[in-house]
């Protein structure tokens, strides 16, 4: 009995061991199959999802307001520097802007962003054209709209040109009239000849046009024949006691020389000159021209004696520039006209500066608008300072011309 029990017990233990081993093998096989399934599924999912995730992340770009301002400002500066449209070469525009933005982006993202900003601008522009008042919650949106206006508004250039034309109309043009008109005709306009000459000094773009000083240099042929140029002496520039240049004469020095020499060679004035016979012009007509010149000199001398009576033009003797226009239908209010003229002069002086010309169009427009906020007193101080600089420049030019005349005389007369 005992032997049978032991055999049965051994059989039971062997069967239990085999069962446990079979279970362990099955568990290991199951785990291995699960691992294989997981690896295959992860591989397929990664191969399928990776391009989508990359494409979606590449297409998405969170642009800030600062980035938009940098892009628009870069477009404005790029067009100013290259004189080309930004649409002509996207690669060049991308290279020009990419280093200015902190975030990394591609050329396609830049193109899409510019197109979106243009759509937004056209929408806002349409609202404003239909009479809706545009109001922005922050200053960044306002700056973005202004930059977009500079880039995409077709009428912007016309608006700026019209603004400049209006400012030029406010500034007295004062083109110098020809001196061929006698002083008697100018007296009919109730304007003295001396005052009319001073008032007709031209201010072109805020900087007074330099007078033709080359005619102040004595004519070489005239000096060789010892014939004084009457018209040249009449309109010669006086520098003593702070008096500045007057308007240049319209009669050419050489023509005056020829007419005076020809008339002096003929003792009998009734006999026509030899060269004037070819032109069918009698010598008497030449005499009338010289008489008119003498009358003009006498009237100028009499008007120079009465300069003190002209109170309005008293200050312009030192500066050589008149900032008051003579209106055709009456004179406007003096204070308002002076303010407009001074503002226009300051803006045009600033435009001629090399630093201003090196800036972009948007920065130039902002600086010109800021000049309008300058006070009246400060504006007058700047005008007076510019007058002093201009007078110094004119004196230097006169000295240079005088020195050139001396060199010319030395070269002619050994």
Swiss-Prot record:
Superkingdom, taxonomy of origin: Eukaryota
Low complexity: bias regions: 38-50
GO cellular component: nucleus
Region Disordered, annotated ranges: 36-57, 167-191
Tissue: Expressed in the apical meristem and young leaf primordia. Detected in the vascular tissues of rosette leaves, in primary and secondary roots and at the base of flowers and siliques.
GO BP term (any one): regulation of DNA-templated transcription
Principal subcellular localisation of the protein: nucleus
UniProt subcellular location: Nucleus
This protein's record includes keyword Transcription regulation: yes
Pfam families attached to this UniProt entry: GeBP-like_DBD
Assembly and binders: Homo- and heterodimers. Interacts with GEBP, GPL1 and GPL2. Interacts with GEBP.
Primary role: Probable transcription factor. Involved in stress responses. Plays a repressive role in cell expansion by counteracting the positive role of CPR5 in this process, but does not regulate cell proliferation or endoreduplication.
Annotated family: Belongs to the GeBP family.
Protein known as: GLABROUS1 enhancer-binding protein-like 3
Species of the source: Arabidopsis thaliana (Mouse-ear cress)
């Amino acid at each position: 009995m005992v032997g049978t029990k032991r055999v049965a017990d051994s059989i039971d233990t062997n069967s239990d061991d085999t069962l446990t081993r079979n279970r362990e093998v099955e568990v290991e096989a199951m785990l291995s199959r699960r691992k294989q399934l997981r690896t295959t599924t992860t591989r397929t999912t990664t191969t399928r999802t990776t391009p989508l995730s990359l494409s979606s992340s590449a297409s998405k770009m969170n642009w800030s307001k600062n980035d938009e301002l940098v892009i628009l400002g870069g477009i404005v500066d790029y067009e100013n520097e290259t004189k080309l449209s930004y649409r002509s070469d996207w690669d060049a525009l991308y290279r020009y802007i990419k280093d200015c933005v902190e975030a990394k982006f591609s050329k396609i993202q830049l193109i899409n962003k510019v197109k979106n900003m243009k759509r937004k601008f056209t929408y806002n522009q349409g609202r404003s054209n239909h009479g809706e008042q545009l109001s922005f919650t922050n200053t960044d949106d306002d700056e973005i709209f202004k930059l977009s206006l500079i880039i995409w508004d077709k009428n912007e250039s016309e608006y700026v040109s019209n603004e400049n034309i209006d400012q030029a109309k406010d500034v007295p043009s004062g083109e110098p009239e020809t001196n061929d008109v006698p002083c008697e005709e100018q007296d009919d306009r109730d304007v003295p000849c001396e005052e009319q000459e001073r008032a007709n000094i031209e201010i072109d773009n805020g900087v007074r046009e330099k007078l033709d000083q080359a005619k102040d240099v004595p004519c070489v042929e005239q000096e060789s024949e010892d014939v004084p140029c009457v018209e040249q002496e009449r309109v010669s520039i006086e520098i003593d006691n702070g008096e500045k240049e007057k308007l240049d004469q319209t009669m050419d020095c050489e023509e005056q020389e020829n007419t005076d020499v020809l008339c002096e060679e003929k003792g009998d004035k009734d006999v026509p000159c030899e060269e004037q016979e070819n032109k069918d012009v009698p010598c008497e007509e030449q005499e009338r021209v010289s008489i008119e010149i003498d009358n003009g000199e006498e009237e100028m001398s009499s008007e120079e004696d009465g300069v003190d009576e002209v109170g309005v033009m008293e200050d312009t003797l030192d500066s050589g520039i008149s900032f008051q226009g003579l209106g055709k239908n009456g004179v406007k209010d003096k204070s308002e006209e002076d303010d407009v003229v001074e503002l226009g002069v300051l803006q045009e002086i600033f435009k001629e500066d090399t630093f201003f010309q090196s800036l972009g169009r948007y920065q130039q427009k902002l600086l010109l608008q800021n000049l309008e906020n300058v006070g009246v007193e400060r504006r007058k101080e700047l005008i007076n300072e510019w007058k002093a600089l201009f007078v110094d420049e004119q004196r230097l030019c006169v000295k240079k011309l005088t020195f050139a005349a001396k060199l010319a005389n030395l070269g002619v007369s050994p």
